Amino acid sequence: MKTQRDGHSLGWWSLVLLLLGLVMPLAIIAQVLSYKEAVLRAIDGINQRSSDANLYRLLDLDPRPTMDGDPDTPKPVSFTVKETVCPRTTQQSPEDCDFKKDGLVKRCMGTVTLNQARGSFDISCDKDNKRFALLGDFFRKAKEKIGKESKRIVQRIKDFLRNLVPRTES
């Protein structure tokens, strides 16, 4: 014979199981890192392995490529880091450090996983080639000069055409 107490007990256990069913997916979702969080973790790893005197901080993150939803699948990343004023031996977060004036800039590429529990990364960083930076400055300045010159040339052509039109005397 079933008692009223058994009915309450069954209802209570049903409620507990229902709540567990709702909470477990949230716990799984909470373990997935965002693209930027995964990159910041990779930078922490780069700083730990670095033999340089100062920490590096994220300078520029390339747009996130289209990815599948599996957090365990390695995702391609590329970003740029720059040397900060904080010594590597500090316990300070690189995000709290100012960039060092004329600090070393490194271009990093590789893969990260978004699974927080088993997060991993395979990143390699190379110094940004100063020649390419200088070449970029050259092209930027050339573009500015060409822009100014083209305006001047257009104005000269307009003036020339205005002088070609016969003037009528009134």
Curated annotation (Swiss-Prot):
Stated name of the protein: Cathelicidin antimicrobial peptide
Domain notes from UniProt: The cathelin-like domain (CLD), which is the propeptide part, does not seem to exhibit auto-inhibitory function, as it does not inhibit the antibacterial activity of antibacterial peptide LL-37.
Coiled-coil regions listed: none
GO molecular function: lipopolysaccharide binding
Keyword field: Antibiotic, Antimicrobial, Cleavage on pair of basic residues, Disulfide bond, Immunity, Innate immunity, Secreted, Signal
Propeptide: 31-131
Gene: CAMP
Superkingdom of this protein's organism: Eukaryota
Role played: Antimicrobial protein that is an integral component of the innate immune system. Binds to bacterial lipopolysaccharides (LPS). Acts via neutrophil N-formyl peptide receptors to enhance the release of CXCL2. Postsecretory processing generates multiple cathelicidin antimicrobial peptides with various lengths which act as a topical antimicrobial defense in sweat on skin. The unprocessed precursor form, cathelicidin antimicrobial peptide, inhibits the growth of Gram-negative E.coli and E.aerogenes with efficiencies comparable to that of the mature peptide LL-37 (in vitro).
Compartment annotation: Secreted; Vesicle
Signal peptide annotation: 1-30
SUPFAM superfamilies in UniProt: Cystatin/monellin
Disulfide bonds: 86-97, 108-125
A Pfam family of this chain: CAP18_C
